[in-house]
Amino acid sequence: MPQANLTLSPHDQQVLDSIFNPLELSSLQTNNLIPAESDLKDEEPDTQAIKASRELELKAIALSESGELDGALELFQQSLNLAQRASVLNNRAQTLRLAKRDEEALDDLNKALELANDQQTRTKCHAHCQRGVLYRKLDNLEAARADFEAAAQLGSKFAREQLVEINPYAALCNQMLRQAFDQLK
C-alpha cells in the first residue's frame, strides 16, 4: 500500500484550520480568551424567592429526567411564578423539546436569552446551544450558526463541533479527503 506524505505547508495548515475551526485563527492564540464551558457560572441574587424557585427547578429537572414530563412542566411553572429566571426557562425548554413541543421550547429559549444577564453565562451558553439545535432542526442554518457562534464564544465545545458540521466548506473538504483516502486504499 503506498504511503502518502502528509506534511502540509504552514499556509495549507492555516487554510484547513480556518475551515475546521471557524472560530479560531491559527495565527492567534484565542483558546486563552475563550473560557472552558465547565468554568461558566450563573450568579443570581440570594433572595428567598430565588432559593425557592431554584428548589422547584431542581425537582422539575429530576422529574424530567425520570420521564415525568407533565409533572416537571408543572413544577417549572411554579418556579417561574416565584421568580422569572432564565435558568428555569432554559430547563423548561429542554423538557418541552423532550415532549416534542418545539415551538414552545423556542419561545422559552428566546425569553431565557432576553432575561439572562452577563452574570448568567452558563444559562446563556446552554440556551444558545438548544436554540441552535432547534433552528438546525427547522433548517434555519443561518440562525443556528449565529446561536452556535454565540455559544462557542462562551466556551461550548458542542457548539464549535456544530459549527464545523454546518460549515459547507468543511463538508466539501471532508468529502474530498474521504475520496482521496479511498483512492489510496
UniProtKB/Swiss-Prot annotation:
Q: Decide whether keyword Repeat is in the record.
A: yes
Q: Does the keyword Disulfide bond apply?
A: no
One GO-annotated biological process of the protein = tyrosine metabolic process
The UniProt keywords, alphabetically, are: Repeat, TPR repeat
List residue spans for each TPR repeat: 53-86, 88-119, 125-158
Under InterPro entries, the record lists: TPR-like_helical_dom_sf, TPR_rpt, TTC36
Kindly indicate where the leader peptide sits in this chain: none
PROSITE patterns reported in the protein's UniProt record? TPR_REGION (PS50293)
Would you identify the family this protein belongs to, as annotated? Belongs to the TTC36 family.
Give the protein's recorded name: Tetratricopeptide repeat protein 36 homolog
To which species is this protein native?
A: Drosophila melanogaster
